[in-house]
Amino acid sequence: MYDRHEVSVKVALYSSDGKRTLLMRHWGDAGFGLPGGHIDAGEMPDEALERELREELGITIDATPADFYVRDPYDTTAKNHKIILGYTATIDGDIELPDQACDGSEAGPVWLTRAELRLLTKSRQATGIFC
């Protein structure tokens, strides 16, 4: 049994042409993930997603609510049970992404093609392809 349940929101953001997905690069070797984050006390999931995207990317979107729900697959021994509410959205136009180091030393958003996503799922060492 878990001591606590943590709920967060994540969104799969697609480019308007459907060829790219926006991921957040984590610091150093921590890999990549979907934009989003924890739901604060008193927040509804949609409000949390709106706040997280404003904080992380400076954008507002219309997301399709809760397309998927998952338990954190990386946390099998923790006392906390993490539930992720998933959303999807398409970004009309493009968003301005900050310049980042190609060595993975900087965190932030990156656009990835399907081929890059496939390579990333095969090898967590694939950070050089994103420059």
Where are the language model's segments positioned?
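Short, acidic/hydrophobic/Gly-rich beta-strand patch recurrent on exposed beta strands
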Residues: 23-25
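Unchanged
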Residues: 39-63, 71-126
